[in-house]
C-alpha cells in the first residue's frame, strides 16, 4: 500500500504551485505543466519522493534519532505543533531565534529557565510574590513558552529537521547546514532543491497540503518508535480554526531576542 495516493494528493491541493513568474528554474524537474499562469507540481514524483522520505524517517526514528519540525508561517504553525506533539518530535512554530541551533548551549539555558518558571507557577510560588513581581515573572514565562515551548524536551541538537516554507526558514536552514543536520523540506515551485537533503515537491501554502505531508511524516516517526501504526487509531483532524490564533503574528511588535538572552554573535 502506498504511503500516499495520487487521489489524496490531488484532494489536498498538493499540486498547486506558484505563479509561473515566481518560479525557481531548479524546480523544473518536479513541475508537470503550467495552467492559467500557475505551475502544476508533478504528483507522480511527489508520491515517489514521499515514499522515500517516509522510509528514511521511519528508519531514523527506529534508530532513536531526534526530529525537529520547523514552520513559522500562519498556515503551518498550528499543524506543526499538532503533528510534532502527536509523534513525540520537537517543534518551532513561532519566529526563529538566531542561534537556536548553532548557539544551542545559550538557548538551552533559557529552556531551563522556562521549566523553572513553569514549576514556580504550578507550585504557587509566583502567586505568593508581590503583585508587580508576579506580573513580571508571568510575562517572562509567557514569552519563553511562546518561542521555546516546542523545544522544552529537546536535550540535544536534532538529528533530522523537517521544514515547511524553505524561503521563510532560510536562517534555520543555514544553521542546519553549518551543523550538518539533514533537512527534509516541502518544496514549492519557488524553492531551491539544492537546500534540501530529502525533497518533497508540494504546495507549502495550503493548510490541507501541509497537513497531509506533515501527517505522513509524523506517522513515519510514530511507526518507527512504536511499531506498525494502528489502522483503527483515530487521529484528530486538524481544526483550521486553530490557525486563527496566528493571524496577527505578522503584525506583532518584533520580539527582542535579548529578552531571551540569546547572543547570536556567539555563532561566529
Curated annotation (Swiss-Prot):
One of its GO terms (molecular function) is structural constituent of ribosome. The keyword Ribonucleoprotein applies. InterPro entries: Ribosomal_uS2, Ribosomal_uS2_bac/mit/plastid, Ribosomal_uS2_CS, Ribosomal_uS2_flav_dom_sf. GO terms for cellular component: cytosolic small ribosomal subunit. Residues 231-268 have a biased composition (Acidic residues). Pfam families: Ribosomal_S2 (PF00318). Belongs to the universal ribosomal protein uS2 family. This is Small ribosomal subunit protein uS2. The lineage of its organism: Bacteria, Bacillati, Cyanobacteriota, Cyanophyceae, Oscillatoriophycideae.
Amino acid at each position: 500500500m502506498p504511503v500516499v495516493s495520487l487521489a489524496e494528493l490531488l484532494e489536498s491541493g498538493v499540486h498547486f504551485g506558484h505563479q509561473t513568474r515566481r518560479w525557481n528554474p531548479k524546480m523544473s524537474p518536479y513541475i508537470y505543466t503550467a495552467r492559467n499562469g500557475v505551475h502544476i507540481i508533478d504528483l507522480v514524483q511527489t508520491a515517489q519522493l514521499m515514499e522515500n522520505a517516509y522510509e528514511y524517517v521511519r528508519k531514523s526514528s527506529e534508530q532513536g534519532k531526534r526530529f525537529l519540525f520547523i514552520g513559522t508561517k500562519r498556515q503551518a504553525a498550528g499543524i506543526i505543533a499538532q503533528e510534532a506533539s502527536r509523534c513525540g518530535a520537537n517543534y518551532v512554530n513561532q519566529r526563529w531565534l538566531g542561534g537556536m541551533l548553532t548557539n544551542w548551549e545559550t538557548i538551552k539555558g533559557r529552556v531551563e529557565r522556562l521549566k523553572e518558571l513553569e514549576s514556580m507557577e504550578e507550585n504557587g510560588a509566583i502567586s505568593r510574590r508581590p503583585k508587580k513581581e508576579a506580573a513580571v515573572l508571568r510575562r517572562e514565562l509567557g514569552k519563553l513558552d511562546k518561542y521555546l515551548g516546542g523545544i522544552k524536551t529537546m536535550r540535544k541538537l536534532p538529528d533530522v529537521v523537517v521544514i515547511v516554507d524553505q524561503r521563510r526558514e532560510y536562517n534555520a536552514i543555514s544553521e542546519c547546514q553549518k551543523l550538518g543536520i539533514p533537512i527534509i523540506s516541502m518544496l514549492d515551485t519557488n524553492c531551491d532543491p539544492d537546500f534540501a537533503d530529502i525533497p518533497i515537491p508540494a504546495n507549502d501554502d495550503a493548510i490541507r497540503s501541509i497537513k497531509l505531508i506533515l501527517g505522513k511524516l509524523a506517522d513515519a516517526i510514530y511507526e518507527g518508535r512504536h511499531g506498525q501504526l494502528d489502522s483503527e487509531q483515530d487521529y484528530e483532524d486538524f481544526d483550521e480554526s486553530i490557525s486563527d490564533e496566528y493571524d496577527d503574528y505578522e503584525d506583532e511588535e518584533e520580539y527582542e531576542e535579548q529578552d531571551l538572552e540569546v547572543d547570536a554573535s556567539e555563532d561566529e
